[in-house]
């Protein structure tokens, strides 16, 4: 059957996603852009007998986001050095070695599925390589294991999603082979 995918730009209220430099991490529907919310899109999909999918990039944040304002310690960074950024000169990578961050990332999918169970597909993007090899969560003697622990954290999140939503089709993509 046919599938409509709502791509990047559907989220962010304090910082509406109007380009690549804000709002990653603020996974709330932008009321200005979608006054009927995702519910309106789902109703249209039902009317036209097509499935609905949605784009997310839950491993990332922007320095211009509510998430970054609330949890700057959730970002991969090296102490006493300027923060490296990716797309839009504001994109940063969340620290998936941290169980609280793993819970947040799982929660992105879980909240969408709880609120919109008709979602049949998620495009999980990853448009930023790990830029700063430093974790405020890992102890000093484990910093050299950052990439391994990051991927273990990602696998834990994906296993939780698959266990709870076995029918959800997910496409994990990585711009430029970032993963």
Where does each model-flagged region fall?
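Catalytic domains of carbohydrate-active enzymes, especially glycoside hydrolases
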Residues: 1-11
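A cross-family glycoside hydrolase active-site/sugar-binding cleft signature
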Residues: 5-7, 53-57, 123-125, 171-173
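Acidic/aromatic-lined carbohydrate-recognition and catalytic surfaces
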Residues: 11-69, 163
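Active-site neighborhood of glycoside hydrolase catalytic domains
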Residues: 30-48, 69-179
């Amino acid at each position: 059957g046919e599938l409509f995918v709502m791509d990047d730009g559907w989220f962010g209220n304090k910082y509406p996603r109007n380009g690549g430099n804000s709002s990653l991490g603020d996974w709330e529907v932008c009321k200005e852009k979608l006054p009927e919310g995702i519910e309106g899109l789902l109703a249209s999909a039902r009317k036209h007998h097509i499935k609905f999918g949605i784009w997310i990039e839950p491993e990332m944040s922007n320095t211009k986001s509510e998430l970054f304002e609330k949890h700057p310690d959730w970002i991969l960074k090296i102490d006493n050095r300027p923060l490296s950024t990716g797309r839009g000169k504001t994109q940063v990578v969340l620290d998936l070695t941290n169980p609280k961050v793993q819970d947040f990332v799982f929660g992105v999918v879980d909240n969408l599925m709880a609120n919109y169970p008709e979602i049949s597909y998620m495009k999980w993007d990853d448009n930023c390589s790990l830029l700063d090899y430093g974790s405020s969560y890992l102890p000093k003697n484990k910093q050299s294991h950052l990439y391994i622990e990051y991927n273990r954290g990602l696998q834990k999140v994906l296993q939780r999603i698959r266990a709870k939503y076995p029918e959800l089709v997910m496409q994990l993509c990585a711009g430029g082979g970032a993963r």
